[in-house]
A protein has these predicted regions:
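DNA-recognition helix of helix-turn-helix
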Residues: 71, 75, 141-166
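Structural recognition of an alpha-helix C-terminal capping motif at a helix-to-coil junction
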Residues: 40-47, 60-72
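Short, basic/polar amphipathic helix motif occurring as a linker/hinge flanking DNA-binding modules
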Residues: 77-104, 167-173
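Hydrophobic-face residues of short alpha-helical interaction/recognition segments
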Residues: 24, 28, 53, 66, ...
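A short pre-motif secondary-structure segment
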Residues: 123-127
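Amphipathic, Lys/Arg- and hydrophobic-enriched alpha-helical face
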Residues: 16-35, 52, 113, 162-165
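Sigma70-family region 2
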Residues: 5-6, 44-61, 80-82
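A short, charge-rich alpha-helical start-of-domain segment used by transcription regulators
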Residues: 2-26, 39, 50, 121
Length: 183
C-alpha cells in the first residue's frame, strides 16, 4: 500500500486511479463474484472518492480508503440484488490436467465463498487475495483488528465445512452411482 498523503484534485487523483484501479477492481470482483458488476462498482468507487476527496484525511493510505468505499459498495450491491448466494456459471477450457485441477479448485473455492456473508467474504478476500494484514483490513473496513481476525476465522471454518460437505456428497453420489451400475 502507498503511504498516507493529501489528494491533489486533478493530477494526483488521476495517478491514484491508475495506481489503485486494478487492486480495487479485484477486491470488489472477489466479493460480488461478477466481473461486469465489479467493473461498474469500481467506477462508482472512484466517482464517489472523487466527489468526497475534500473529506479524505490522510491518516491511512488512499488505497485503503478506496478499498473501503469499494467494499462498502459491493456489500450494498449484494444486499440490494440478493446475490449473496449466487455463483456465476464459469466455463473453463482446460488443455491439460493441471489446468483442469486449478479450474476445479477455483470452482470449489468460489462455491465455498458463496456460503459466506458479504462481510465475511470481504475479510477473506482482503486477507488471502489482496494480502493485507489484519490491521490494514481493519482500516479498510472500519472495524477493530480483533473483529477482522474473528471474521477470517469464522469464514475459514464455514468454507472448510462447505468444502467438506461437498466432497462427502460427491463421494456418496459416485458410490451410489457405482452401485447402480453393479460396481
Amino acid at each position: 500500500m502507498s503511504e498516507a498523503k493529501e489528494l491533489d484534485p486533478a493530477t494526483q487523483f488521476k495517478q491514484l486511479y491508475d495506481q489503485e484501479y486494478l487492486s480495487v477492481f479485484r477486491s470488489i470482483r472477489a466479493v460480488v463474484l461478477d466481473a461486469a458488476a465489479a467493473e461498474d462498482l469500481t467506477q462508482e468507487t472512484f466517482v464517489r472518492a472523487y466527489r468526497a476527496r475534500h473529506r479524505y484525511t490522510p491518516t491511512a493510505p488512499p488505497g485503503a480508503w478506496l478499498r473501503r468505499i469499494g467494499i462498502n459498495l459491493a456489500i450494498s450491491h449484494l444486499r440490494r440484488q440478493k446475490l449473496a448466494r449466487f455463483l456465476p456459471a464459469r466455463l473453463y477450457m482446460a488443455p491439460d490436467r493441471r489446468d483442469y485441477d486449478r479450474a476445479e479448485a477455483r470452482d470449489v473455492v468460489g462455491k465455498a465463498m458463496t456460503a459466506l456473508s458479504p462481510k465475511l467474504r470481504a475479510a477473506i478476500v482482503l486477507h488471502y487475495y489482496d494480502g493485507l494484514t489484519r490491521e490494514e483490513i481493519a482500516a479498510v473496513l472500519g472495524v477493530p483488528a480483533g473483529t477482522v481476525a474473528s471474521r477470517i476465522a469464522k469464514a475459514v471454518a464455514i468454507m472448510r465445512k462447505t468444502i467438506g460437505n461437498d466432497q462427502e456428497s460427491d463421494t456418496t453420489r459416485s458410490t451410489s452411482e457405482g452401485a447402480l451400475r453393479g460396481r
